[in-house]
Swiss-Prot record:
Component of the Integrator complex. The core complex associates with protein phosphatase 2A subunits, to form the Integrator-PP2A (INTAC) complex. It is found in: Nucleus; Chromosome. GO terms for biological process: RNA polymerase II transcription initiation surveillance; snRNA 3'-end processing. PANTHER family: INTEGRATOR COMPLEX SUBUNIT 8. This is Integrator complex subunit 8-like protein. GO terms for cellular component: chromosome; INTAC complex. Belongs to the Integrator subunit 8 family.
Length: 198
């Protein structure tokens, strides 16, 4: 008997209340991704990006668990890549958008979209994100653009990345797949720390 309100609660009702409490879990990353979708549809790109990154970070224990990270990459990030790309594009972060365009899966589409961004926004490209490009055609487009602009610092950085033997497309598929997986993992960690800790 509840002495304050005079309500009697039997033991079965208590068990049902406790089981209902266990069913309602709001620390699930899917909910945050859905909230990000709502913000994206309302054209609030900064908030959408934060909720996408927070939701995916929560699903992967903030990219510390490699198994959860690979599952989340295939389950969420591949499908969210176009929305995250749009968020970066509208937030005037062209280099991050170029890196995310590699997640589209279609290299021709990636190169077309990235070529347009590189030609229009070459002066705003953040060199900190060059290391996360694994597609050689994108690196070649960047190299050609910066050679025309005679930007020696960026040319040097891109040449260092291209000369890395692990990025070679003729490597064994397992080596290249592992390199791409690690690069994606590091990119999402860097993006999350940059955009969630602001």
């Amino acid at each position: 008997m509840n002495k304050i309100f005079g309500v009697k609660i039997d033991s079965q009702q208590k068990k049902r209340q406790q089981s209902n409490k266990n069913l309602t879990v709001f620390n699930n990353g899917r909910y945050l991704i859905y909230i990000g979708d709502i913000h994206f549809d309302r054209k609030f790109h900064r908030e959408a990006l934060r909720y996408y990154l927070l939701g995916c970070g929560l699903e992967t224990a903030f990219y510390s668990d490699p198994v959860k990270t690979s599952v989340t990459n295939s389950k969420y990030l591949t499908f969210l890549s176009r929305r995250i790309f749009d968020c970066f594009y509208f937030l005037r972060a062209p280099m991050q958008a170029i890196v995310v365009s590699q997640f589209f899966g279609n290299l021709n589409q990636t190169c077309l979209v990235s070529f347009k961004i590189i030609q229009e926004e070459y002066y705003q490209l953040d060199t900190n994100y060059f290391q996360y490009i694994w597609e050689l055609p994108l690196l070649e487009i960047l190299l050609t653009t910066f050679t025309k602009q005679k930007d020696l610092k960026k040319i040097y950085l891109i040449n260092q990345i291209i000369s890395n033997p692990i990025i070679n497309e003729n490597n064994h598929p397992d080596i290249r797949k592992n390199f791409i997986k690690n690069t994606k993992h590091n990119f999402w960690k860097a993006i999350s720390s940059n955009y969630l800790l602001q």
